[in-house]
Amino acid sequence: MTAAATVQRAQFRQLFVLIAVAFIDMIGFMLVLPVLPFYALKLHATPVQVGWIFAAFSIAQLISAPLWGRVSDRYGRRPALLIGLLASAAAYTVFGFADTLWLLFLSRFVQGAGGGTTGVAQAYVADTVRPSDRARALGWLSAATSAGVVVGPILGTFASRLGTQGPGLIAAGLCVLNAIFAWYWLPESRVAQAPGEAQPKRSVWGPALHAFLNPRLPVSRLIWIYGAGMLAFASLNAVLPLYLADEFGVNERSFGYFLTYFGILSLVIRVVLLGPVVDRFGERSTVRIGCVALIVGFLLYPMVGNLWLLAILVMPLVPIGTALLFPSTTSMLSGRVDRRELGVTMGVAQTFGGVARSVAPVLSTKIFQDLGHAWPFVVAAGIVGVVSLLAVRIGPAPEPTPVPVPAPSAPAAAAAATIDTPVA
C-alpha cells in the first residue's frame, strides 16, 4: 500500500468515528426536543417561560462556543469533545428528573454549553481531511446530524411511553456510551505545536469582535455569511409550525412528520448532491447556488396554497440551499486561517450562528404576529439576498499547506480491518 493510500485510510477512519459521534449526539438531542414544550406545560409554564427555556440552549451555546474553540486549540479537539458529551449526559439526567421549571431551564442551559463543541468538530474535520475534500467531509458530518434528526424523534416517541423520565434518561445513557466510544476510538487531530513556539494569547471574544467590526476581510466575510444564513434559516424553523397550523391545520402531532421529512431531505441532499456540485462548480459557486435555492424557497412558501404541493415542490428548496451553503462556507473558512487558530475561528462562526438562533425566533414570530403570515418568509429571503451580495465578492483561497495526519491510536488501527472505504 502506498503512503498516500495509508494517509487516506487514516483520514477516513478518523472521519468515520467523528461522524458516528455526531450522529449519536444528535439522536440524544432529538429524543428530548419534541417533548420539551409539553413537559414544560405540565409544570405550569407560561408561553413566555417556554420560550426562555428554548432560548437557554442557544444562549449557553453562544457563550461556550468560542471558549470550546480556545480550549481545543490549546489542549486538543478530543478532550473538548469528550467533556462536551459528558456535560450533555448530565443535562439530560437533570431533564429526566426535573420537577420544577428552574431545573428544566438548568438542563437546557447545561445542554447548550455542552453543545458548544460544534466548532470543535468542524475544526477536527479541517485537521484531518485534505483541503480538496473538506466541503464533502463537512457535508457528511452535517448528514450525520440530519440522520439523527430522522431517528431521534422516532426513538423519542417510544421513550415517552416510559413516562416523562424516559426520553431524558435514554438520551443521557446514549451520551455516556458515546463518550466511551469516542474515548477509545477517536484520536487527537490537533497539529502539534513546534518546540519553543509560544502559544498565542488573546481574549477569547477578541476574534468575534474583530469579525463583527471588519466584515470586508475574507475570513470575517465568510463568518458573516454563515451568521446571516443561519438567521434566515432559524427564522423559518421558528415560524413554520405557526404558519402550517394557521394555514393548513397542522398540529403538534402531525408537525413531527414534517420534522422527519426535513431530516430525510437534508440527509439525502448532503450525501448525494453536495459532493458532485462542489466538484463541478467549486465552493464559491456552490455557496451562491445555495443562496438562490433559499431565496426561491422562502418566496414561494406563502404563494402555494396546497399543502401537498408545498411539501413536494417548495419545502425541498430550503434543505437544498442549506446543504450547499453551510458546509461550503465552513470549508472555505477552514482554508483561510492559521492551523493553530482553527478551533477559535470555528467557535467564532458558531457564535455568530448562536446570535442568529437567539434572535431569529423572536424576530420572525413578531413579524408573523404584527405584519402577517407572508412577511417572515419575505424578510428571510431578503436576509439571504444580503448573503448573496457578500458571497459575490468571495476571493480565491490561498495555496493550502500540507496537513500532517497524526498516527491512529491502537483501537483505531484495529478498526482498519473492518473500515476499508476511502473518503469519496
Where on the chain are the PLM-derived regions?
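Juxtamembrane intracellular "pre-TM" segments in multi-pass secondary transporters
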Residues: 2-12, 187-224, 412-414, 420
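Short amphipathic helix-loop junctions that connect adjacent transmembrane helices
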Residues: 34-47, 239-254
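Helix-breaking motifs and short loop linkers at transmembrane-helix boundaries and internal kinks
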Residues: 44, 76, 97-102, 304-305
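Conserved MFS/SLC helix-loop-helix module at the cytosolic interface between two early adjacent transmembrane helices
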Residues: 62-99
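Helix-to-loop junctions at the C-terminal end of transmembrane segments
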Residues: 64-76, 269-283, 368
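Cytoplasmic helix-loop-helix junction between adjacent transmembrane helices
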Residues: 107-146
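Helix-loop-helix hairpin linking two adjacent transmembrane segments in secondary transporters
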Residues: 141-184
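C-terminal transmembrane helical hairpin of 12-TM major facilitator-type secondary transporters
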Residues: 284-329
